[in-house]
Amino acid sequence: MTSLKISALALVAVLIAGLVAGCGIAAPGRSTPAVCTTSAQKGTCGPFNYPQITRTTSSTYVNNNVWNPIPGWRQSLSVTNPGRWRVTANIPAGNTPVVSYPSVGGNYGQTNDTSTPLSEYASIYSSFSENMNATSKTSAWAAYDIWLGQGSSANWSGEVMIQHDFADNGACTFEATATFGGSGGVPVQTWNLCQFGSELVWKLPSNEQVGSVDILPMLRWLVTHGYLPANSGLWAIGYGWEICSTGGVNEKFQLNRFSITTTPVSPEAPQAPSRAAG
């Protein structure tokens, strides 16, 4: 799961402990100079002022989150910028929950501990390019992790994941299918919705390592169909790989390009005063 520099993310650590799933692997990308490296369990690179990721508040961080460490784990993070970074992970095989979620992310509330109502957004687009070439040894998936609050408050209302590249990522309860895209350069695609505990998961039917996502209508669909409260607001967005196992060997996960673009609703233009007839 995501560590996004918000105090309420103690909740994430509690919830992730219950996330049990299988999890595919990554190939190395091009070598680029790193400005930050860390192998600490919860090591953080940042803050970055990265114009390709727009938000309401806070800076962008890249985190080496290891939420459920097991004996023998090793994971190192090497960051050039929030859109180009890589992780080398060595996590023993076994029927384990998600061990780590190396990820880039930040907050979208008016403060670090609040959310921004979805009604205040005109669009939320994101694009990605990553390498995760699955083998039989690794259990992992590339995913957005989106946390929502109630209106502009700090009260948590839900967690939504968007998975687009995965292998052996466990079973979840199928709920529905829906089609999104067609604006902002995002292709029209059909997604499957399933539920895993308290988590709502949008999944592409087939893997995609380069693409774009129209996030706002996916969240509004969940509100309209009763999966999220009507007053839901955007709290935080993370993006990375949830890793369960690499089979006890070193595997590389590479992010080559990443962006999030948010556009607020434009205020209504002032109307000219009406003239009295006379």
Regions found by a protein language model. Give the residues of each.
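Extracellular-facing segments of soluble proteins and assemblies that are Gly/Ser/Thr-biased and enriched
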Residues: 95-179
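Short, low-complexity, disordered segments immediately C-terminal to signal peptides
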Residues: 26-36
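Bacterial N-terminal signal peptides
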Residues: 10-20
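Solvent-exposed N-terminal domain segments of exported/luminal and surface proteins
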Residues: 35-88
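Short helix-loop boundary/capping segments
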Residues: 149-217
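Bacterial N-terminal signal peptides that target proteins for export
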Residues: 1-10
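Long, compositionally biased interface segments
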Residues: 205-278
